[in-house]
Swiss-Prot record:
The active site is at residues 278, 343. Pfam families: EF-hand_7, Rhomboid. Residues 34-69, 70-105 form the EF-hand domain. One of its GO terms (cellular component) is membrane. Its EC number is 3.4.21.105. This is Rhomboid-related protein 3. The gene is RHBDL3. It is a multi-pass membrane protein. Belongs to the peptidase S54 family. May be involved in regulated intramembrane proteolysis and the subsequent release of functional polypeptides from their membrane anchors. GO terms for biological process: proteolysis. It comes from the Eukaryota. GO terms for molecular function: calcium ion binding; serine-type endopeptidase activity.
C-alpha cells in the first residue's frame, strides 16, 4: 500500500539472483544493483536487440513459466496489461512497473483496457480464506470502488507497516484524557472544570501566538461523551483507510482537517477556545462518505445506505452536542465553551483534499489537477487565517476573554 508497494512475487528472488550472477560475474566487486537494474537484466534477456521493448507474447511466456509463483489475482492483472497493448509490445518502464508493483495513470489505464482477463470471479466469491485474508478482503470492499483495485490491494497488502498513525493518535488521545480525568477528578464534561483551560494543549484565543495549540488541541476533549465518538470513528473509518492508502496520505488529510478546524474557529468564532479531534475525524469521515456517494455503483460494502445513514446520524448528534455546549452558560465566564466550527473546517477538508486522496488509490497525487487546485485553495485559506490572526483581532478591537 502507499506510494511504493513492496515488490511482487512475479519472479522468484533466488532465481533472479542466479541470473544476475551469471550475466555479471564481477558484481561482487561493485555496489549492489538497484531493483530496476535487476529488472533490466531480466528484460534484456527478452530484448536481445536492445530495442527497449519486448513482445507481449514473450511477456506472457514469462508469466506462464512462473505461474506457480504468482498470486492468482496478480497474474490476472499482469495478463490484463499484456492484452491491452494493441501494438503487441511492452516498454521497459511498463515492465518495471509490472514486476515491482509500481503503478501510474498510464499503467492503470492499460490495466482497465485489458479487461478480457478480469472477467473471472470476484474476491467475494473466493472460498477457504484465512481470517487475515477475510479481513483484508473486507477492508478492500469497504474502501475501494473498483474490482481491479480491490484485487491489487488484496494481493499486495503485507501489513508492513501496520496502520500506526491512527492507532498512535487514538492511544495518545485516550492517554491524555485519562490523565486529565484523574488530575481534575472529572471525566464527564471535563470542559466545565475551572482548571480545564489552563492546560497548555488547548487552543485559546488569547494564546493564539503559541502556534502549537492549533494542532495539540486534538489531545483535549470536552468529556468522555466527546472522546468516545471520535475514537470509534477513528478506529472504524480511519484505520481501514490507512490500511489502504497509507499513513502519509491519511495522516495528511487528518492533520489538514485539524489545522483547518482551529484556523476556522480563529476566523469565524474568535472568542472561543477549541478542543477535540473532531476536525481531523470529520475530514476522514466526510471524505469516505463522499467517495462512497461518488462511486455508489462500484462500492460493494454491505448495507451501505443504512451504514451511511448511521454515520450521518452519529456525526449530526456530535455536532449538535458541540453546538449545545458552545451556547450553554459558561462555567468560566466571560470565556465561552469550546467552539463547534472546527467540525465544519474538517468537513471542508474532507470533501476537497480528502476526496482526491481516496479517489486516487496508489496514483501520483501530483499528476491530478484537482489536487493542485485544492492544495492552492487550502494554502490561500491558511495564509488568510494567519493574516487574520495577526491583524483582525486588533483592527476589530475585539474584547477577548482573559487568558486562563
Amino acid at each position: 500500500m502507499g506510494e511504493h508497494p513492496s515488490p511482487g512475487p512475479a519472479v522468484a528472488a533466488c532465481a533472479e539472483a542466479e541470473r544476475i550472477e551469471e550475466l555479471e560475474p564481477e558484481a561482487e566487486e561493485r555496489l549492489p544493483a538497484a531493483p530496476e537494474d535487476h529488472w533490466k537484466v531480466l528484460f534484456d534477456q527478452f530484448d536481445p536487440g536492445n530495442t527497449g521493448y519486448i513482445s507481449t507474447g514473450k511477456f506472457r511466456s514469462l508469466l506462464e513459466s512462473h505461474s506457480s509463483k504468482l498470486d492468482p489475482h496478480k497474474r490476472e492483472v499482469l495478463l490484463a496489461l499484456a492484452d491491452s497493448h494493441a501494438d503487441g509490445q511492452i516498454g521497459y518502464q511498463d515492465f518495471v512497473s509490472l514486476m515491482s508493483n509500481k503503478r501510474s495513470n498510464s499503467f492503470r489505464q492499460a490495466i482497465l483496457q485489458g479487461n478480457r482477463r478480469l472477467s473471472s470471479k470476484a474476491l467475494l466469491e473466493e472460498k477457504g480464506l484465512s481470517l487475515s485474508q477475510r479481513l483484508i478482503r473486507h477492508v478492500a470492499y469497504e474502501t475501494l470502488p473498483r474490482e481491479i483495485d480491490r484485487k491489487w490491494y488484496y494481493d499486495s497488502y503485507t501489513c508492513c507497516p501496520p496502520p500506526w498513525f491512527m492507532i498512535t493518535v487514538t492511544l495518545l488521545e485516550v492517554a491524555f484524557f485519562l490523565y486529565n480525568g484523574v488530575s481534575l477528578g472529572q471525566f464527564v464534561l471535563q470542559v466545565t472544570h475551572p482548571r480545564y483551560l489552563k492546560n497548555s494543549l488547548v487552543y485559546h484565543p488569547q494564546l493564539r501566538a503559541q502556534v502549537w495549540r492549533y494542532l495539540t488541541y486534538i489531545f483535549m476533549h470536552a468529556g468522555i461523551e466527546h472522546l468516545g465518538l471520535n475514537v470509534v470513528l477513528q478506529l472504524l473509518v480511519g484505520v481501514p483507510l490507512e490500511m489502504v492508502h497509507g499513513a502519509t496520505r491519511i495522516g495528511l488529510v487528518y492533520v489538514a482537517g485539524v489545522v483547518a478546524g482551529s484556523l476556522a474557529v480563529s476566523v469565524a468564532d474568535m472568542t472561543a477556545p477549541v478542543v477535540g479531534s473532531s476536525g481531523g475525524v470529520y475530514a476522514l469521515v466526510s471524505a469516505h462518505l463522499a467517495n462512497i456517494v461518488m462511486n455508489w455503483s462500484g462500492m460493494k460494502c454491505q448495507f451501505k445506505l443504512l451504514r451511511m445513514a448511521v454515520a450521518l446520524i452519529c456525526m449530526s448528534m456530535e455536532f449538535g452536542r458541540a453546538v449545545w455546549l458552545r451556547f450553554h452558560p459558561s462555567a468560566y465566564p466571560p470565556c465561552p465553551h469550546p467552539s463547534f466550527v472546527a467540525h465544519l473546517g474538517g468537513v471542508a477538508v474532507g470533501i476537497t483534499l480528502g476526496v482526491v486522496v481516496l479517489r486516487n488509490y496508489e496514483q501520483r497525487l501530483q499528476d491530478q489537477s484537482l489536487w493542485w487546485i485544492f492544495v492552492a485553495m487550502y494554502t490561500v485559506f491558511v495564509l488568510f487565517a494567519v493574516f487574520w490572526n495577526i491583524f483582525a483581532y486588533t483592527l476589530l478591537d475585539l474584547k477577548l476573554p482573559p487568558p486562563p
